Curated annotation (Swiss-Prot):
A GO MF label: rRNA (cytosine-2'-O-)-methyltransferase activity
Keyword Transferase attributed: yes
Reactions catalysed according to its record: cytidine(1402) in 16S rRNA + S-adenosyl-L-methionine = 2'-O-methylcytidine(1402) in 16S rRNA + S-adenosyl-L-homocysteine + H(+)
Keyword Transmembrane helix on entry: no
Protein name: Ribosomal RNA small subunit methyltransferase I
Protein's gene: rsmI
Annotated InterPro entries: 4pyrrol_Mease (IPR000878), 4pyrrol_Methylase_sf (IPR035996), 4pyrrole_Mease_sub1 (IPR014777), 4pyrrole_Mease_sub2 (IPR014776), rRNA_ssu_MeTfrase_I (IPR008189), SAM_MeTrfase_RsmI_CS (IPR018063)
Keywords, ordered alphabetically: Cytoplasm, Methyltransferase, rRNA processing, S-adenosyl-L-methionine, Transferase
Subcellular location(s) per record: Cytoplasm
GO CC terms of this entry: cytoplasm
Entry's family note: Belongs to the methyltransferase superfamily. RsmI family.
Main location: cytoplasm
Origin species: Helicobacter pylori (strain ATCC 700392 / 26695) (Campylobacter pylori)
Known EC number: 2.1.1.198
Role of this protein: Catalyzes the 2'-O-methylation of the ribose of cytidine 1402 (C1402) in 16S rRNA.
């Protein structure tokens, strides 16, 4: 049996009873970082309530195997489905497996090979931050971590905002970001989503948890005066309607004269308008 086991994102008290039962029962742990998972079990065992109800949670002999984005496919190619005849749990360092953490490929593998598995509900930064944001929209778009390089990051942000422009309703976008890239990401957001409101959550559920709300430029101004630490969740509210762009294929389907279509296509593709015009005439003749 395979279990997808959520772990606390900061506060150890957020562990669930079901998770504790699985932690004590399992023989093998597939871990994002084996050191972090071992430390979690050790810390949980220090709690007198947990140690009384689950005395073997840290003492039982079990196997810890690294399972992350750099080795997941290699691992799955090497094992046989019978490997999961044991009691096995997949764990990320913090939060829910598969949400910007290892696990999604394992679920696909289990489905393909008819392996029984269960996903335990539990703590994750995504829903915690969205609920804390105060944004009234009952839906959101989860973008996960943005690319490290500015050019790629800006391109991804632009693509997301452009895609959301086609929706009639406002749809907040949730990003994860690390402390050393936070200001760079906020500056990119400010350039591409100027005037939009942002909710930023620092170190959710931890001792130094903190919330920020305001326009992106205002949050940049506040954070530039402080030392940025901890993991962050950003919830961007796309309040301003972004005019969607019509794609080339959609434009060519409009009821327009061939010459007009050719001129539009030439501008969009940098091709010769005259050649495109004769191509459109030929297409209409063959219809």
């Amino acid at each position: 049996m395979l279990y997808f086991l959520p772990t606390p994102i900061g506060n150890l008290a957020d562990i669930t009873l079901r998770a504790l039962e699985v932690l004590e029962r399992c023989e093998v742990f597939l871990c994002e970082d084996t050191r972090v998972s071992k430390r979690l079990l050790h810390l949980l065992a220090q709690n007198p309530i947990i140690s009384h109800s689950f005395p073997n949670i840290a003492t039982k002999k079990r196997e810890f195997i690294a399972f992350h984005s750099h080795n997941d496919q290699e691992f799955l190619n090497q094992i046989k489905p019978s490997f999961f005849d044991k009691e096995i749990a997949v764990m990320s360092d913090a939060g829910m497996p598969s949400l910007s953490d290892p696990g999604m490929s394992l679920a696909a593998y289990a489905l393909k090979h008819n392996i029984q598995y269960d996903v335990l509900p539990g703590a994750n930064a995504l829903t915690t931050a969205f609920c804390a944001s105060g944004f009234l929209e009952g839906r959101f778009f989860y973008a996960g971590f943005l690319p490290h390089k500015s050019k790629e990051r800006r391109l991804k942000i632009a693509k997301i905002l452009n895609a959301l422009a086609y929706l009639e309703e406002k749809t907040p976008v949730v990003f994860y970001e690390s402390p050393h890239r936070l200001l760079e990401t906020l500056k990119d957001l400010n350039d591409l989503a100027k005037g939009m409101h942002l909710f930023a959550a620092k170190e959710l559920t931890k001792l130094h948890q903190q919330y920020y709300l305001g326009e992106v430029s205002q949050i940049i101004e506040r954070l530039q005066q402080s030392t940025i630490q901890g993991e962050w969740v950003l919830v961007l509210l796309n309040e301003k309607k972004i005019e969607p762009c019509m794609g080339l294929s959609a434009l060519l389907e409009l009821d327009l004269p061939p010459k007009i279509k050719a001129k539009i296509e030439a501008v969009m593709t940098q091709k010769n308008a005259k050649e495109l015009y004769f191509q459109r005439l030929l297409e209409e003749k063959n219809q």
